[in-house]
């Protein structure tokens, strides 16, 4: 049989069958324009889709800046089995190699899908086995509504509303509202109504899936996120001082509600002339809203919630579900805030009348709510001593202010059970004069204005070096570069008055090893320029050399470093030393407009009692002020306790110094008649210890806040007056937990004039206190006065020895009877020191002429042996001085050796405490002629 006709028959049957099948199964896939909305379905939908399908669609938008949105019909049925056989996948591009947005199967329809660009790739695949109804989706151009609802607000006040308010808002919105304020203006935002779609499965605050409102401290997605809000709970009042506050409003394609309405207004920030960083932050007043307070757990009866943890609250307090040192109370301050002190209080149960309180606790801080640092004292976690009963308030001061946003209190020990109420003290960074954040955090400084010497990878580029808002930070190419080789630079756009920087460590990503994941800079230098070419370094005013600033001790906790104002448009930071993980840095620049800078004294510390000391809670606002000179100017990297600098001007306050008000009298100046004395204004106060000689003696102590100077010594200045012959002694002692060390002493009448005292406070690994001890001997009439204690930033250390006679060597000591013990110095004074102490105000006839007729009598017993020792010591010093004078006279009388002898005397070194050596030079003219 001829095979040729048979072949033609088979071919005809094949093509005819193929044509019939093609007519029955319409082709799937294609290229679709989303200019007009349309639908894509699986073949045969809603009937079962056929087997062996491989359909591909490309959906594109007519404009390159447009996006595409896909919404699926809830009737969705594709074979399961982990999407191995039948599935639909969507990719963010025009091919199968684009990023996968989702791969779906089963009976649950996918959520709304939005492209990042103008093209989407869709693929549907089925195998030979089981089939289902398939899918149906609608594609269209994603309409954000930004043309209608995105606005900038610059007027002093205004209203922000969701689109269509008070009617229901539209679907698929992405709106941005930005409030812009001028420097020294605070933005206050108050919501009037709030109603967005609520997620019934919402777990916690900010867990919003459908419609929500984000509020940003700065430009959206650049500045830190303050909070995410949805449902019907109205956000509390917001106060921003960074100059930019933004809101982004997102809605999906489903349920729509009435939306929101809010009012904003701007108020001028005028810092006080004597800025004090000791303001209650709002736990007691309610300025900290309930939504900002949370806890690890709450007692099951619902009567001891975190929101009841406000100081002096009349309804119980916060109690966890279980009493454990793993529990914590947390406060979100919403913005970066200086924390300087914490006040705690227990609670009495309204149901059982039993008292519960926390006896000790730890402090944890964070800038983002995820990376936490336990507050340390030296190398160990600091354990704060808290309450001894359920009602008294205990104030604990931090020895250095902390810049943070989130605060956790972790109870360590307690009585009967954990119960806590508290208040936080501090201030905002921008409260200080000329301390505006110039735009790194808020995004006002663009990415193009941030540069660096080198960059490791894109994820750690200079644009990631924004304070707090970035989770990574800047990493240079070489993690272990030479000191000063790498730098990070900020272009401020226009010349500004720059007064400081805030420096923070950085976090690495997945491509950085675990050891390198957390890096920070320990020491750095700062340079500045007006043109980007001519650079100058910030100078240390004490040494007139390039200032080497202290950096961070933790990768998440920021530190402020201030310096004298300089004009600059460009600022560079040069890392000099860093953590083992290498160089990692985030940054903000502080300053103000070039014409706004004013020389103002400021401090960053509260005038509160020392930590671990039980004190009555200061109810009066004046009780936390300590005078116009109570603070040292622009802390300038001196990490000293708040309240150290003090002039004792306010009647009920001694800054951070502790003394017995019954012994140290507060006296008031009247303008001096002596032109050689320094001039004081009327009503200026000082402290005075006095005796009229009718009692056996007098002894008083004046104790500083805790000092921690592990890195470098500083110079302490004060004014003093000592009258009363050889029975008067004033000494300064460094007291630590294990030892006491004499630093300075005078033990004789100094006359009626006020004198300067200067002492070097040495570096010391442990925390210590400075103690002024005054002694007026038995049967002696005299007085000792002290005023204006402060840390000097303009006196070189080599000049910080005044008078020289007060530095008599290591072995010299004035014996003081052991009348004190323990660490709490209020107990020492109240319980163990004898004598009648009174707090009075008296006037003097002159700066150096007190009225002796009104002097108080004191009672103190000096041992006769002690008096003998003092007398013999005085005689020894007198004989030594006489011999030295004779030797000097003889030496200078011999002309051949006079020059060499004077030179030898000039080069004589006095060796002081802690290995510090200071040269005391004698004037050439006085060397021989006055002998």
From Swiss-Prot:
Signal peptide range equals: 1-20
Assigned keywords, A-Z: Calcium, Developmental protein, Differentiation, Disulfide bond, Glycoprotein, Heparin-binding, Membrane, Metal-binding, Neurogenesis, Receptor, Repeat, Signal, Transmembrane, Transmembrane helix
Q: Cytoplasmic side of the membrane: what ranges?
A: 890-931
Residues in domain MAM? 642-802
Q: Under the cellular component aspect of Gene Ontology, which terms does the record hold?
A: axon; glutamatergic synapse; plasma membrane; postsynaptic membrane
Q: Which CDD domains match?
A: CUB, FA58C, MAM
Pfam name, any one: DUF3481
- What membrane topology does the annotation report for this chain? Single-pass type I membrane protein
Acidic residues bias: where?
Answer: 824-835
Q: Which residues cross the membrane?
A: 865-889
Q: What is the annotated localization of this protein?
A: Membrane
What InterPro entries does its record include? ConA-like_dom_sf, CUB_dom, FA58C, Galactose-bd-like_sf, MAM_dom, Neuropilin, Neuropilin_C, Neuropilin_MCO_CoagFactor
**Residue ranges of every copy of the CUB domain listed in the record:** 28-142, 149-267
Q: Where is this region: Disordered?
A: 298-317, 601-621, 819-854
Q: Which molecular function term from Gene Ontology is one that the record holds?
A: heparin binding
Q: In which tissues is it expressed?
A: Expressed in developing CNS, PNS and in some nonneural tissues including limb buds, developing bones, muscles, intestinal epithelium, kidney, lung and submandibular gland.
Q: Which residues bind Ca(2+)?
A: 197, 211, 252
Q: Which PROSITE patterns does the annotation name?
A: CUB, FA58C_1, FA58C_2, FA58C_3, MAM_2
Q: Where is the composition biased (Low complexity)?
A: 836-851
Disulfide linkages recorded for this protein, renumbered to the chain, are 28-55, 83-105, 149-175, 208-230, 277-427, 434-592
- Domains as described in the record: The tandem CUB domains mediate binding to semaphorin, while the tandem F5/8 domains are responsible for heparin and VEGF binding.
Q: Fill in the subunit field for this protein.
A: Heterodimer with NRP1. Binds PLXNB1.
Similarity section? Belongs to the neuropilin family.
Q: What does this protein do?
A: High affinity receptor for semaphorins 3C, 3F, VEGF-165 and VEGF-145 isoforms of VEGF, and the PLGF-2 isoform of PGF.
What protein name is recorded for this chain? Neuropilin-2
């Amino acid at each position: 049989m001829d095979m040729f006709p048979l072949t033609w028959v088979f071919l005809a049957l094949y093509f005819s069958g193929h044509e019939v099948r093609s007519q029955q199964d319409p082709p799937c896939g294609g290229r679709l324009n989303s200019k007009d909305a349309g639908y894509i379905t699986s073949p045969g939908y809603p009937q079962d889709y056929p087997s062996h399908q491989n359909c591909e669609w490309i959906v594109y938008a007519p404009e390159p800046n447009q996006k595409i949105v896909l919404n699926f019909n809830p009737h969705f049925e594709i074979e399961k089995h982990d999407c191995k056989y039948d599935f639909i996948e969507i990719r963010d591009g025009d091919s199968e190699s684009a990023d996968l947005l989702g791969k779906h199967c089963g009976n649950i329809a996918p959520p709304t899908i939005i492209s990042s660009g103008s093209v989407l790739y869709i693929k549907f695949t089925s195998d030979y086995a089981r089939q289902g109804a398939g899918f149906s989706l609608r594609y269209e151009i994603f309409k954000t509504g930004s043309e209608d609802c995105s606005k900038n607000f610059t007027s002093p006040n205004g209203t922000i509303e969701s689109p269509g308010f008070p009617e229901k808002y539209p679907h698929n919105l992405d709106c941005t509202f930005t409030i812009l304020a001028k420097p020294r203006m605070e933005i206050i935002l108050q919501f009037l109504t709030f109603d967005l779609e609520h997620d019934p499965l919402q777990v916690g605050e900010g867990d919003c899936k459908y419609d929500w409102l984000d509020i940003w401290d700065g430009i959206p997605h650049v500045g830190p996120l303050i909070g995410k809000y949805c449902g019907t709970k109205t956000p509390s009042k917001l106060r921003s001082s960074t100059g930019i506050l933004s809101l982004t409003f997102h809605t999906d394609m489903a349920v729509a509600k009435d939306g929101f309405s809010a009012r904003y207004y701007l108020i001028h920030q005028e810092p006080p002339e004597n800025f004090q960083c000791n303001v209650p932050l709002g736990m007691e007043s309610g300025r900290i809203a309930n939504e900002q307070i949370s806890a690890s757990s709450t007692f099951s009866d619902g009567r001891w919630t975190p929101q009841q943890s406000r100081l002096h609250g009349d309804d119980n307090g916060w109690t966890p579900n279980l009493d454990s040192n793993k529990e914590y109370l947390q406060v979100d301050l919403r913005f970066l805030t200086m924390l300087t002190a914490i006040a705690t209080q227990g609670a009495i149960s309204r149901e059982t009348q039993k008292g519960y309180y926390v006896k000790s606790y730890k402090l944890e801080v964070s800038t983002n709510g995820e990376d936490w640092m336990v507050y340390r004292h030296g190398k160990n976690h600091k354990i704060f001593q808290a309450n001894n009963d359920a009602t008294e308030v205990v104030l604990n001061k931090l020895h250095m202010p902390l810049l943070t946003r989130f605060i956790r209190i972790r109870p360590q020990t307690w009585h009967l059970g954990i119960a806590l109420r508290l208040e936080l003290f501090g201030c905002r960074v921008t409260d200080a004069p000329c301390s505006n954040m110039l735009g790194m955090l808020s995004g006002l400084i663009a990415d193009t204005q941030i540069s660096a010497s080198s960059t490791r990878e894109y994820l750690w580029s200079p644009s990631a070096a924004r304070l707090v808002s970035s989770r990574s930070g800047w990493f240079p190419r070489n993690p272990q570069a030479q000191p000063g080789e790498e730098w990070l630079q900020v272009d401020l756009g226009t010349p500004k008055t720059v007064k400081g920087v805030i420096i923070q460590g950085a976090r690495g990503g997945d491509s950085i090893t675990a050891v390198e994941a957390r890096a920070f800079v320990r020491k750095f230098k700062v340079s500045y320029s007006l043109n980007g070419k001519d650079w100058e370094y910030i100078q240390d005013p004490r040494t007139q050399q390039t200032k080497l600033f202290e950096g961070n001790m933790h990768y998440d906790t920021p530190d402020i470093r201030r310096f004298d104002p300089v004009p600059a448009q460009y600022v560079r930071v040069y890392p000099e030393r860093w953590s083992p993980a290498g160089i990692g840095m985030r940054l903000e620049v502080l300053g103000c407009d070039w014409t706004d800078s004013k020389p103002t004294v400021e401090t960053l510390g509260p005038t509160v009692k020392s930590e671990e000391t039980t004190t009555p809670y200061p109810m009066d606002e004046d009780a936390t002020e300590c005078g116009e000179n109570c603070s040292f100017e622009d802390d300038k990297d001196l990490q000293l306790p708040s309240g150290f600098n003090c002039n004792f001007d306010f009647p009920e306050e001694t800054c951070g110094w502790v003394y017995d008000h019954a012994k140290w009298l507060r006296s008031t100046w009247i303008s001096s008649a002596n032109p050689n004395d320094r001039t004081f204004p009327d009503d200026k106060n000082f402290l005075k210890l006095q005796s009229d000689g009718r009692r056996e003696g007098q002894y008083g102590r004046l104790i500083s806040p805790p000092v921690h100077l592990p890195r470098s010594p500083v110079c302490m200045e004060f004014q003093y007056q000592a009258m009363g012959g050889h029975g008067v002694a004033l000494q300064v002692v460094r007291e630590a937990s294990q030892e006491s060390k004499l630093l300075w002493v005078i033990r004789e009448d100094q006359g009626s004039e006020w004198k300067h005292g200067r002492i070097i406070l040495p570096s010391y690994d442990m925390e210590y206190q400075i103690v002024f001890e005054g002694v007026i001997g038995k049967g002696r009439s005299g007085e000792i006065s002290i005023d204006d204690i402060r840390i000097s930033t303009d006196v070189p250390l080599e000049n910080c020895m005044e008078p020289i006679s007060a530095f008599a060597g290591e072995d010299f000591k004035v014996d003081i009877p052991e009348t004190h013990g323990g660490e709490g110095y209020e107990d020492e004074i109240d319980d163990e020191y004898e004598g009648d102490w009174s707090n009075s105000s008296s006037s003097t006839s002159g700066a150096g002429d007190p009225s002796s007729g009104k002097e108080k009598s004191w009672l103190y017993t000096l041992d006769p042996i002690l008096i003998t020792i003092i007398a013999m010591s005085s005689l020894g010093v007198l004989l030594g001085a006489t011999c030295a004078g004779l030797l000097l006279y003889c030496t200078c009388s011999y002309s051949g050796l006079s020059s060499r002898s004077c030179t030898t005397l000039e080069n004589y070194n006095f060796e002081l405490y802690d290995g510090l050596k200071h040269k005391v030079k004698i004037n050439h003219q006085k060397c021989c002629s006055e002998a």
